[in-house]
Design a protein with these regions (language model features):
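Active-site neighborhood of glycoside hydrolase catalytic domains
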Residues: 1-108, 112-129
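Flexible, acidic glycine-rich loops studded with aromatic residues
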Residues: 88-96, 100-244
Length: 244
């Protein structure tokens, strides 16, 4: 792309897929992980809308909206990943309503929208797709007061679905985006709130008692502070044997 519209790759050029094949080969060579995350969220279609070649391609293919073009692109990229013996993960945008069948069954869908995650988890698992939840756990978002209880209460299985659907939930992942986070505030923004999410995801279902968790996580926060980690308070409190 040239001009002021930059960002998305051109999905109608074969050179795009040649480049991505080489890039993903490097990813395979460097990282042993089986799962490769391909992204796919919040794609800005402005550059595609202003490219005559793309418009002509869409007309030829019968694509009436740009999400279909994105589906075409991601399908080809997933095939490259498969040829390398890896599996793909994508953001929920790729499996938009009506497009769930556009990705292979072994694709992992990461659900990120906070307000609609339960509906989306039900939707993608109904189509037999595995999923990871992030919609509850955005650590870059801050609020006044105690925000950790909402992280702790979130249950990735709390959506309308069968046992078979809920068996497709692999777990969850906390996200911390960097628009307003850098080295000056990363650690206090991250800790101990990430510990709250870790306990929720790695504990049995019968460990949801908030009062016990509050005491336990408060102690853990003090443990981190004693070790030199600038973990922010979870609630009004003071760590013993520390300056106040």
């Amino acid at each position: 792309m040239s001009g002021k519209y930059r960002g998305a790759l051109n999905p109608v050029h074969e050179a795009t897929y040649q480049f991505m094949g080489k890039l993903l080969q490097e990813v395979k060579d460097v990282f042993p992980d089986q799962l490769v995350h391909l992204g796919g969220d919040e794609v800005n279609f402005a550059c595609w809308k202003n490219d005559a070649e793309i418009t002509q391609f869409m007309e030829k293919q019968g694509y009436d909206y740009y999400a279909k073009l994105q589906t075409y692109y991601i399908q080809r990229i997933i095939k490259i990943v498969e040829s390398l013996g890896k599996e793909s993960a994508v953001w929920e945008d790729v499996a938009a309503k009506g497009q769930e069948g556009s990705v292979p069954k072994d694709t992992v869908i990461q659900v990120w929208r906070p307000r609609t995650w339960a509906q989306k988890m039900a939707q993608v698992t109904r189509h037999g797709l595995r999923t990871i939840l992030s919609g509850c756990w955005y650590l870059d978002l801050i609020s006044y007061g105690e925000d950790w209880p909402s992280y702790y209460r979130c249950d990735p299985h709390a959506f309308n679905g069968t046992k078979a659907q809920k068996d497709l939930v692999l777990g969850g992942e906390a996200c911390l985006w960097g628009e307003f986070v850098d080295w000056t505030n990363l650690l206090p923004r991250l800790w101990p709130r990430a510990s709250v999410i870790a306990e929720r995801l790695w504990s049995s279902e019968d460990t949801p008692d908030m009062e016990d968790a509050s005491v336990r996580l408060g102690e853990h926060r003090c443990r981190m502070v004693r070790r030199g980690i600038p973990a922010q308070p979870l609630h009004p409190s003071a760590c013993p044997f520390l300056p106040v």
